[in-house]
UniProtKB/Swiss-Prot annotation:
Organism: Haemophilus influenzae (strain ATCC 51907 / DSM 11121 / KW20 / Rd)
GO biological-process terms attached to the record: 1,6-anhydro-N-acetyl-beta-muramic acid catabolic process; amino sugar catabolic process; N-acetylmuramic acid catabolic process; peptidoglycan turnover
Pathway: Amino-sugar metabolism; 1,6-anhydro-N-acetylmuramate degradation; Amino-sugar metabolism; N-acetylmuramate degradation; Cell wall biogenesis; peptidoglycan recycling
UniProt key word Lyase: yes
Cited InterPro entries: Etherase_MurQ (IPR005488), Glucokinase_regulatory_CS (IPR005486), MURQ/GCKR (IPR040190), SIS_dom (IPR001347), SIS_dom_sf (IPR046348)
Function: Specifically catalyzes the cleavage of the D-lactyl ether substituent of MurNAc 6-phosphate, producing GlcNAc 6-phosphate and D-lactate. Together with AnmK, is also required for the utilization of anhydro-N-acetylmuramic acid (anhMurNAc) either imported from the medium or derived from its own cell wall murein, and thus plays a role in cell wall recycling.
Protein name: N-acetylmuramic acid 6-phosphate etherase
Lineage of source species: Bacteria, Pseudomonadati, Pseudomonadota, Gammaproteobacteria, Pasteurellales
Signal peptide from the UniProt entry: none
A GO MF label: carbon-oxygen lyase activity
Amino acid sequence: MNDIILKSLSTLITEQRNPNSVDIDRQSTLEIVRLMNEEDKLVPLAIESCLPQISLAVEQIVQAFQQGGRLIYIGAGTSGRLGVLDASECPPTFGVSTEMVKGIIAGGECAIRHPVEGAEDNTKAVLNDLQSIHFSKNDVLVGIAASGRTPYVIAGLQYAKSLGALTISIASNPKSEMAEIADIAIETIVGPEILTGSSRLKSGTAQKMVLNMLTTASMILLGKCYENLMVDVQASNEKLKARAVRIVMQATDCNKTLAEQTLLEADQNAKLAIMMILSTLSKSEAKVLLERHQGKLRNALSK
C-alpha cells in the first residue's frame, strides 16, 4: 500500500520540488521572504484561469440557498480548517444562520487545533459527519484538498453525489480523483511549494481565495450588501455596532445622530434602518417592502 501511495504522490505537482527554492536553507531572511512573496504572486494568476468554474459554482450555490439548501465544506488538515474559518465568518458578516454555511474537518473539532492521526484516511467518518448534519440533495458539498486525492474528501463527494446533491472540488493538481467525481472542478494549479509538499502555503492561500469568492459572491447575489456595504452585518460587539452606524451614514449620507436613532428603532438592523431613511417609510412598512423583494435593498428602493 505504501508503494502505491508513494507512486501516487510522485505524480502530484504539489509534491514536486521547486527549483527556485532548492537552496532556501542557505538564503538570508530577506531572500527567503522575498522568494515566498514571488511564489505567492502565482496564486491569483492560477485562480484567474478558474474564474469560469468559480462563477458557475457561485450561481449553483445561490440557487441552492434560494431553495433552502446549505453550503457544506469538507476537508482535512489545512483544507478543513480553511473551510471552518470561511463558514464561521458568514453569520457575523452577512447576518445568516450558522446552519447556512458549515465547515466540517476530518477528525472533528479537535482537529481544528491539533493534528488527528489517520483522520484524512477515515472514509467512514465523513459519512457519519455528513449524516449527523442531515446532509441532503438540496445542499451543496465542496470538497477541499490540495492533492485532490484525500480519501475522507473523496468519500464525502461520492456520498453527496449518490444523494443527487451538487458537488464541487477544489484542488491544486490537474485531473485529480476529486475532479473526476465533482460536478464542478476548480483546479488552482499554483505549482510546487517552496517547501516540498507543504500545501498549507500557495495551495492553502489559493483555497482561501476561492472560498472567499464562493461565499462573498453568493451573499452579494442574495442581496446581503448594498453598493459595497455590509448592510446585513450583525452588530454583536462595540466595533460592529460602530460599523453599523458608519454603514447607515455612508448609505444615506445622514448624520451620526439620525443613524443611531434609526438603528435603535430598527433593532440594530442596518439594512432596515437604511430602507427607513431613504424611503421615509415606517419600520413596519420598510420591513414589508424588503420582504417583498427578498431582502434586496437596491430592488426595494427602486420601487
